Regions:
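Surface-exposed strand-loop-strand hairpins of Gram-negative outer-membrane beta-barrel proteins
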Residues: 19-39, 53, 106
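Extracellular loop and loop/strand-boundary signature of outer-membrane beta-barrel proteins
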Residues: 23-26, 58-62, 98-103, 140-147
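Predominantly the C-terminal beta-signal and adjacent terminal strand-loop region
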Residues: 119-165
Length: 165
């Protein structure tokens, strides 16, 4: 018999979230994009999970700018502190941008380290909040713009539902 403290706790959580992101373009702007997204977390053990996210930042745009991203990667979960469970993650994938004033669009490889916490409401329901800093490599690659990569960052808040354990 395997002790419960070491028993694998495979579970699938799915959810939706609201994002408020400091836009990475134009460089050094104070523009924030808002949007919605979805995620899925598959817990392999009590402390290791794999996450996949899709976010669509389409609101409060700067002259038509939008940013979307599709990311996946590992997530490390700490022990519970009451109903809170902090976590750290490092996701990778791609970010897509429609530049302002319809000057073009681009897709870039993105790295996204971040962290947050989930708050268990019930056995199957949790709230979560996280901070993420994205690095869009080889961007923006536009003539006349500084050679600084696009680095959107900000907060996500959402709700998750445990599909199965």
């Amino acid at each position: 018999m395997v002790p419960s403290a070491t028993r694998a706790s495979r579970a699938l959580w799915v959810g939706a979230e609201y994002s408020n992101i400091h836009a990475g373009f134009p460089y050094q702007s104070n523009q924030h994009l808002w949007g919605i997204g979805g995620f899925a977390d598959y817990h392999l053990s009590p402390h290791i999970a794999v996450e996949a996210d899709a976010r669509f930042l389409r609101f409060n745009s700067f002259y038509g700018e939008t940013e979307d991203n599709y990311l996946a990667g590992p997530r490390y979960l700490t022990r519970y502190f009451g109903k809170f469970q902090p976590y750290a993650q490092c996701l990778a994938g791609f970010g897509a941008i429609q530049y302002p004033f319809q000057i073009g669009s681009g897709r870039y490889f993105a790295l996204a380290p971040g962290g947050g916490a989930s708050y268990r409401i019930s056995h199957r329901l949790a709230l979560r909040g996280e901070y993420e800093y994205q690095l869009w490599l080889n961007s923006p690659n536009i003539v006349g713009e500084p050679a600084h990569m696009i680095t959107p960052y900000g907060f996500h808040v959402g709700v998750a539902y445990k599909v199965f354990r």
